[in-house]
UniProtKB/Swiss-Prot annotation:
This is Fortimicin KH epimerase. It is an enzyme of class 5 (isomerase). Catalyzes the conversion of fortimicin KH to fortimicin KR. Its EC number is 5.-.-.-. The keyword Isomerase applies. GO terms for molecular function: isomerase activity. Keywords: Antibiotic biosynthesis, Isomerase. Signal peptide: none annotated.
């Protein structure tokens, strides 16, 4: 949890608004560890129930991803910590730049470091 907490604190130090969003997984113990780490750090968070499975799956659409260098500038990033431990950033959904909507940028994993560029590229899916 050090990376997203540090990212949120760093963003705030530059005057940016931050919000940590959390979706529960089927790994209950790990979920509780994440929540405990956020509480211990004094970081507020929002619990979201929108997932890519179950009742919410029909709400998600397939979007074409873009490489970072293809994207227009965005000054309103949302950082997402997935239940897998992967951390992504993307522009807010209501931004006027269509290419940037729901185009995740893989920041890393809180569980393990990728050993090579090929593994990182597979996770980024760019």
């Amino acid at each position: 949890m050090e990376r997203p907490i540090t990212a949120a604190r760093t963003a705030r130090s530059f005057g940016l608004a931050t919000e940590i969003q959390f979706c529960r997984s089927h790994h209950r113990e790990r979920d509780e560890e994440i929540i405990a780490a956020l509480a211990a750090a004094g970081e507020p968070y929002v619990v979201l129930e929108l997932l890519d499975r179950g009742r919410a799956r029909e709400m998600l659409q397939v979007w074409r991803g873009h490489r970072v260098e293809e994207l227009s500038e965005c000054d309103d990033l949302t950082t997402t910590l997935h239940a897998t431990g992967d951390v992504y950033a993307c522009c807010q959904l209501d931004i006027g730049v269509d290419q940037m909507k729901r185009t995740p940028v893989f920041l890393g994993s809180i569980r393990s470091a990728d050993s090579d560029a090929a593994a990182r590229d597979r996770r980024e899916q760019l």
